[in-house]
Amino acid sequence: MSRRNAAEKRPVLPDPQFNNRLASMMVHRLMKHGKKSTAQKILSDAFGLINERTGSDPIELFETAVKNVTPLVEVRARRVGGATYQVPMEVRQERGIAMALRWLVNFSRSRNGRSMAQKLAGELMDAANEAGNAVRKREETHKMAEANKAFAHYRY
C-alpha cells in the first residue's frame, strides 16, 4: 500500500451537451481507448432513439434507469479464521451509481446485433421499466445479501 496520501477525488463536471453529471459519468464508462467524442455520440444517439420511441425526456428516463439499477447492499468476502464468508454490506451512493453505470454499459454491450446506441437505448428503457439484465443483476445482488444476512455481524 502507498505511504503517500490517498489521491483526492476530482469533481465530475456536467456533460456539456446535456448539462448532467450522470450523463458525463456515463460517457466516461462508455469510452474506449480515450475516444470520448465517439462515446458522446453513442450516448446522444441513444437519447435520440429514446425520445423517438417514448416521446418522453431521455434525461429523466436515464436517471430513472440508473436509480432502478443502483444496488443498496452487496456482499463482500471476509476471511475469518480460515473460512471465507460473504458479508452483506451497504453500498455508498457513489459506488452504487458507479456499479449501476458499469452494469448498464456491460449488459448493453452483450445485447444482440445493431449499433451500440440502439443497444444502450434498449437497456436504458428496459431498466426504466424495471426489466432487463441490469435490473436482474441488482436483484441478484440483493438476494445474495439477503441469503448471507447471518454473517452481517462480521461487517468491517
Swiss-Prot record:
- How would you summarize the oligomeric state and partners of this protein? Part of the 30S ribosomal subunit. Contacts proteins S9 and S11.
Q: Which GO terms describe its cellular component?
A: small ribosomal subunit
Q: Which UniProt keywords apply?
A: Ribonucleoprotein, Ribosomal protein, RNA-binding, rRNA-binding, tRNA-binding
Any Pfam family from its record, for instance, is: Ribosomal_S7
Source taxonomy: Bacteria, Bacillati, Cyanobacteriota, Cyanophyceae, Synechococcales
Q: Which gene encodes it?
A: rpsG
Q: What is this protein called?
A: Small ribosomal subunit protein uS7
What InterPro entries does this protein's entry cite?
Answer: Ribosomal_uS7, Ribosomal_uS7_bac/org-type, Ribosomal_uS7_CS, Ribosomal_uS7_dom, Ribosomal_uS7_dom_sf
MF term (GO), any: structural constituent of ribosome
Q: Where are the transmembrane segments?
A: none
Family according to the record: Belongs to the universal ribosomal protein uS7 family.
Offer one example of a GO biological process linked to this entry: translation
State the protein's purpose: One of the primary rRNA binding proteins, it binds directly to 16S rRNA where it nucleates assembly of the head domain of the 30S subunit. Is located at the subunit interface close to the decoding center, probably blocks exit of the E-site tRNA.
